[in-house]
């Protein structure tokens, strides 16, 4: 087993949070090495690389870059596109953290003989009854625990999370107070890194631009389809089913004398069903690809909280495992706009207990 020394590999994005994390780790006596992953460079910008290198040099810590663009394309972006083509609503940040970012961090650390792993995530970690758990950050507005439900003990035991007890305003003040004015004024990242503004424009570029990368077979023809009501009656034409998500109201491009929302998406017929918000409510769902830290804290309990959207409403539920190996979630109160492909995360007693990917919202 690797020795637990004071060496730590820190994921450095060049932003405020990971930069402050580096300073906090140094103050705590750790020997810090920073690694900046090249996952996706929006508009081809590499300013984040230069900022991370400059900060590492100023702090006197080691720094490396790791080009993960190919694997990010294959595991995250292609997955993102495929899910929308299947009529689902993916959460790529969950997949990236659990299957790419943290495992890559561990792989590189292993090669360097480093035990501890760190990032600028706003989460905390707790050790209870023989298990490590992720716990929500002190700053509820910045808490990122929702995205980390898939991490297992081999990663959790190695994690250092210096930002978990800080608010964002405190982090900015901390950097400014130590003379890192540029770091303190960095803008927050918003949305998915490869389409921070609008996923639809990104999809249209990938799916509808025949000048795209045909070697990767990205181009797939998307034609206009039909909006239907719940009885199957035609309402209007739409741009193509991948450009809509369950629960969507805005951007439908139609005007009716009542509020309607996307209830169903049918890729095989290119049809999208619109209905009232009330009709979108569900009382149960099923999860695949799930992870649970400790089943005794979750299964059969009535006081579990489930979240299906980052920074959104919490709902009480009970959780069981089906004979087919899925997690069956029975909600105490109906929840609207549950979509296949979304992530669901479980909490109890202030701890993240696990989560999974929604695969069904009705018994079929």
Curated annotation (Swiss-Prot):
EC code: 2.8.1.13
Protein name: tRNA-specific 2-thiouridylase MnmA 1
Localization (cell): Cytoplasm
Family statement drawn from the similarity comment of this UniProt entry: Belongs to the MnmA/TRMU family.
A Pfam family per the record: tRNA_Me_trans
Protein's gene: mnmA1
SUPFAM superfamilies: Adenine nucleotide alpha hydrolases-like
Function: Catalyzes the 2-thiolation of uridine at the wobble position (U34) of tRNA, leading to the formation of s(2)U34.
A molecular function GO annotation: tRNA binding
Catalytic activity as recorded in UniProt: S-sulfanyl-L-cysteinyl-[protein] + uridine(34) in tRNA + AH2 + ATP = 2-thiouridine(34) in tRNA + L-cysteinyl-[protein] + A + AMP + diphosphate + H(+)
Keywords: ATP-binding, Cytoplasm, Disulfide bond, Nucleotide-binding, RNA-binding, Transferase, tRNA processing, tRNA-binding
Residue ranges of the region described as Interaction with tRNA: 142-144, 309-310
PANTHER family: MITOCHONDRIAL TRNA-SPECIFIC 2-THIOURIDYLASE 1 (PTHR11933:SF5), TRNA 5-METHYLAMINOMETHYL-2-THIOURIDYLATE -METHYLTRANSFERASE (PTHR11933)
Keyword Transferase tagged: yes
Residues annotated as the enzyme's active site: 96, 193
Matching InterPro entries: MnmA-like (IPR004506), MnmA-like_C (IPR046885), MnmA-like_central (IPR046884), MnmA-like_central_sf (IPR023382), Rhodanese-like_dom (IPR001763), Rossmann-like_a/b/a_fold (IPR014729)
Marked site (Interaction with tRNA) residue numbers: 121, 342
Annotated GO biological process: tRNA wobble position uridine thiolation
A GO cellular component annotation in the UniProt record: cytoplasm
Chain residues that bind ATP: 11-18, 37, 120
Principal subcellular localisation of the protein: cytoplasm
Cysteines joined through disulfide linkages: 96-193
């Amino acid at each position: 087993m690797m020795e637990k020394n004071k060496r730590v590999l820190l994921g450095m994005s060049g932003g405020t949070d990971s930069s402050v994390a580096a300073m906090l780790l140094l103050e705590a006596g750790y020997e810090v090495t920073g690694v900046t992953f090249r996952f996706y460079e929006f508009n081809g910008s590499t300013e984040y690389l230069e900022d991370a290198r400059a900060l590492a040099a100023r702090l006197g810590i080691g720094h490396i870059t790791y080009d993960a663009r190919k694997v990010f394309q294959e595991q995250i972006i292609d997955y993102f596109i495929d899910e929308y083509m299947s009529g689902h609503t993916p959460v790529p940040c969950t997949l990236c953290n659990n299957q790419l970012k943290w495992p890559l961090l561990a792989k590189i650390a292993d090669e360097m003989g480093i035990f501890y792993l760190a990032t600028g995530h706003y989460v905390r970690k707790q050790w209870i009854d023989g298990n490590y758990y992720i716990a929500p950050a002190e700053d509820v507005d910045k808490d990122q625990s929702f995205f980390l439900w898939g991490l297992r003990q081999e990663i959790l035991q190695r994690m250092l999370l210096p930002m978990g007890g800080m608010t964002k305003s405190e982090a900015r003040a901390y950097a400014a107070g130590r003379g890192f004015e540029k770091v303190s004024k960095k803008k927050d990242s918003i949305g998915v890194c490869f389409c921070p503004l609008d996923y639809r424009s990104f999809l249209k570029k990938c799916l509808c631009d025949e000048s795209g990368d045909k070697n990767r077979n990205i181009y797939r023809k998307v034609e206009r389809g039909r909006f239907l009501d719940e009885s199957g009656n035609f309402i209007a034409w739409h741009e193509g089913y991948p450009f809509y998500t369950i629960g969507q109201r805005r951007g439908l491009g139609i005007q009716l004398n009542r509020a309607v929302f996307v209830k169903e998406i049918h890729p095989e017929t290119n049809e999208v069903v619109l209905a009232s918000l009330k009709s979108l409510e569900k009382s149960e769902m099923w999860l695949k690809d799930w992870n649970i830290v400790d089943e005794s804290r979750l299964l059969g309990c009535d006081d579990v909280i489930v979240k299906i959207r980052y920074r959104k409403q919490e709902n009480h539920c009970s959780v069981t495992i089906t004979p087919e190996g899925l997690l069956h979630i029975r909600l105490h109160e109906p929840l609207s706009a549950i979509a296949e492909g979304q992530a669901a995360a479980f909490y109890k007693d202030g701890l993240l207990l696990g989560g999974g990917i929604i695969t069904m919202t009705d018994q079929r």
